[in-house]
Amino acid sequence: MTKSSWSVHAKNLPEHARNPIHTDEGGRAAGFDGALVAGVTVYAYLTNPVLTLWGIDWLRKGSSVVEFKSPVLADELVECVTLLDGTSLNVNATVNDEVRAHCTAYMNMPNSGNLSISSGELLKSEEIHLINEWENYGERAGDNQEIYSERGLIHPAVWPALANHIVEKNLVDGPWIHTRSKIFHHELVEI
């Protein structure tokens, strides 16, 4: 088993203020001590050690499941503690030794079974351009991996961030909290 860690001070990006829970005022109104850091930003932190240990192949064909156990507040020191156990890489995002989020990463996509679409109302199609807001997401959030800017690659945290964008635009009105995501990489995405 291989164990390592990486740390960063958590922060929200300006665009996160679209969800009031990511502002001091909104976080306090919801009963927290301040602004909750976006789950996709915490996921960005969790991917840093995965990329360090598994490299670009994980971005090309890997997958992960991320679960948010309790909030990370802006400016808290997040330590990402990693344990490699053969087929998966487990990363805990801890604040003062308390696990706030957990990510299990896989080098390949696990068999996801039959992914059928539920019946119901379809959302409108939307075209999203990855330049500007999304192209340097990881760097702006605090992930210091240089491969994204050097190779012009989209950070893996952009995928759940885009899913959140769809949720915010179509399904919720007011504050909400991201609790879990499954992310499957199909290929590198370059800008």
Locate predicted features.
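Hydrophobic beta-strand-centered segment that forms part of the acyl-chain substrate-binding groove
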Residues: 41-88, 101, 162-191
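Generic hydrophobic/packing signal
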Residues: 8, 15-18, 44, 50, ...
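HotDog/MaoC-like acyl-thioester-processing domains
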Residues: 1-10, 59, 63, 70-136, ...
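Catalytic strand-loop segment that frames the active site of acyl-thioester-processing enzymes
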Residues: 1-35, 112-176
